[in-house]
Amino acid sequence: MTAKTPLHTTHLACGAKMVDFHGWDMPLHYGSQLNEHHAVRNDAGMFDVSHMTIVDILGAGGRQFLRKLLTNDVDQITHNGKALYSCMCNEHGGIIDDLIVYQRASDNYRVVLNSATRQNDVAWIRAKSEGFAVGLQERRELSMLAVQGPNAIAKTLSILAPAHVDAVSTLTSFECVDVDHWFFARTGYTGEDGLEIIVPNEFVTQLWNDLLHAGVTPCGLGARDTLRLEAGMLLYGQDMDETTTPLESGLAWTVKWEPEDRGFIGMGALVSQKQQGIKRKMVGLTLLDKGIMRHGQKVIIEGCPDGIITSGSYSPTLQQSIALARVPMETGEQVLVDIRGKLIPAKVGKPRFIKQGKPV
């Protein structure tokens, strides 16, 4: 039986087409995935992301623990209310998950993880926390909305209480704030500005309806996927997993090597991979002829082993097919993609296609 978020009946009332997403009954779209995509790029859209896993790490040992657990270094967080994106790796350097960690206080960190990896992630974090002065709380009583787009913050501010408005108005990118049991973060998964809002379950329906009345468009998983693909944001389980490392996933920037004595989990394996030479990289592909690139298709590179499409789709913004692919380091400026037995040329570029609504 699939799990349901507190907004399930609200989604049905809004005309959502529901699908099973890793055991959750979630909206795919509300009639037009294309319109929802454009709403986020040009105005404001909202997503129910209450299926995500929220874990609070409490106690004086929180920072010390996270410096061991994550590839990125929370010592870069210089004050409360800051956020950091990171990978969480196993001892072999394989990516267990990617996540955002928020410092709410010196002894209070919030981690938001992917839903598909909930059970494994929580078990891993709990096991690795032994010996540290921390306690873990999985916050299933909370719901989460992502409000994204160039007008997302303005429309959200128009429906918030004055105390919330004052706090949210001062947030900059990758900052967060708690106000009256509501949590606001200026983060997202679309390549647009916006907020991710975490509230007690009993408040989320009213928040959704207020945003709807303010002109924010309900959006489903379909638009979320094309938006994040255009922005070059990876999807765990598809673009990377425990068989891949940050260094071959375009995520080397999330690995902080200094100080060497930090010794985060997987550091030894990643240092070894770096020294021996990274053999694969993540690139962006733009198809040069008709067709749609999809996950799992082969990428043919002259003189090299085949690469693989990890994510591919039609880009509503660029009006052509785009993809993320893992290919040999020697890959040049053009490749061939095997689409149903036909070899279609594609241009190789950086794994990001759109920034703030504009082509990169």
Swiss-Prot record:
Reaction(s) the record says it catalyses: N(6)-[(R)-S(8)-aminomethyldihydrolipoyl]-L-lysyl-[protein] + (6S)-5,6,7,8-tetrahydrofolate = N(6)-[(R)-dihydrolipoyl]-L-lysyl-[protein] + (6R)-5,10-methylene-5,6,7,8-tetrahydrofolate + NH4(+)
GO molecular function terms attached to this record: aminomethyltransferase activity; transaminase activity
SUPFAM superfamilies found in the cross-reference section: Aminomethyltransferase beta-barrel domain, Folate-binding domain
Disulfide bonds: none
Purpose of the protein: The glycine cleavage system catalyzes the degradation of glycine.
Family under the similarity heading: Belongs to the GcvT family.
The name this protein goes by in its record: Aminomethyltransferase
Source organism of this protein record: Legionella pneumophila subsp. pneumophila (strain Philadelphia 1 / ATCC 33152 / DSM 7513)
Lineage: Bacteria, Pseudomonadati, Pseudomonadota, Gammaproteobacteria, Legionellales
Gene for this chain: gcvT
